[in-house]
């Protein structure tokens, strides 16, 4: 899967909006993930006790983790597909330590698309959504290949 220069530009344009409030976007993404797929919450010992959206919104730890997740993703997206160095340690930790299935990366990708659309409807039209979907699919495909190298069937 290859994105054109124009598609990468669409991805990076919307990502610039994310970077104005990485922690807030990250928190929204995780809340969307956990509400839509409560089973994903079980992978996070630190957040298992958060049962309501209000509890999630009040959690500084959740906000910090959202910041960590989207900061890492932003670093990967900015590499425009040349993300081997960034992906390797991420795949290692997610496969061997956290045991995060690829399906969960699909879930969080959907949450990212939803949050971007809800926060930036005027800047995240069909073209930008399509480009971001392709970029996230490329990320998932490449991390799945790393998982396979590590012997994780996630």
Curated annotation (Swiss-Prot):
It is an enzyme of class 1 (oxidoreductase). The modification Phosphoserine is found at residue 4. Nitrite binds at residue 65. One of its GO terms (biological process) is removal of superoxide radicals. It catalyses: Fe(III)-heme b-[protein] + nitric oxide + H2O = Fe(II)-heme b-[protein] + nitrite + 2 H(+); H2O2 + AH2 = A + 2 H2O. Its main location: cytoplasm. O2 binds at residue 65. The keyword Oxidoreductase applies. InterPro entries: Globin, Globin-like_sf, Myoglobin. Signal peptide: none annotated. It holds the Pfam family Globin. SUPFAM superfamilies: Globin-like (SSF46458). One of its GO terms (cellular component) is extracellular exosome. The keyword Ribosomal protein does not apply. Heme b binds at residue 94. Keywords: Cytoplasm, Heme, Iron, Metal-binding, Muscle protein, Oxidoreductase, Oxygen transport, Phosphoprotein, Transport. Its EC number is 1.7.-.-, 1.11.1.-. GO terms for molecular function: heme binding; metal ion binding; nitrite reductase activity; oxygen binding; oxygen carrier activity; peroxidase activity. Residues 2-148 form the Globin domain. Belongs to the globin family. Monomeric. Monomeric heme protein which primary function is to store oxygen and facilitate its diffusion within muscle tissues. Reversibly binds oxygen through a pentacoordinated heme iron and enables its timely and efficient release as needed during periods of heightened demand. Depending on the oxidative conditions of tissues and cells, and in addition to its ability to bind oxygen, it also has a nitrite reductase activity whereby it regulates the production of bioactive nitric oxide. PANTHER family: MYOGLOBIN. This is Myoglobin. It comes from Balaena mysticetus (Bowhead whale). The lineage of its organism: Eukaryota, Metazoa, Chordata, Craniata, Vertebrata.
């Amino acid at each position: 899967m290859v994105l054109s220069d124009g598609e990468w530009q669409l991805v990076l344009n919307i990502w610039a909006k994310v970077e104005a409030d990485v922690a807030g976007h990250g928190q929204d993404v995780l809340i969307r993930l956990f509400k839509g797929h409560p089973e994903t919450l079980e992978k996070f010992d630190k957040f298992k006790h958060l049962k309501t959206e209000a509890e999630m919104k009040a959690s500084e730890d959740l906000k910090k983790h959202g910041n960590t997740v989207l900061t890492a993703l932003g670093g990967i997206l900015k590499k425009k597909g040349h993300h081997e160095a960034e992906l390797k340690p991420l795949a290692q930790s997610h496969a061997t330590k956290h045991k995060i299935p690829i399906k969960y990366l699909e879930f969080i990708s959907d949450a990212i698309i939803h949050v971007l659309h809800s926060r930036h409807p005027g800047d995240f039209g069909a073209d930008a959504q399509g480009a971001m979907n392709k970029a996230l699919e490329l990320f998932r495909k490449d991390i799945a290949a790393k998982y396979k190298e590590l012997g994780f069937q996630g």
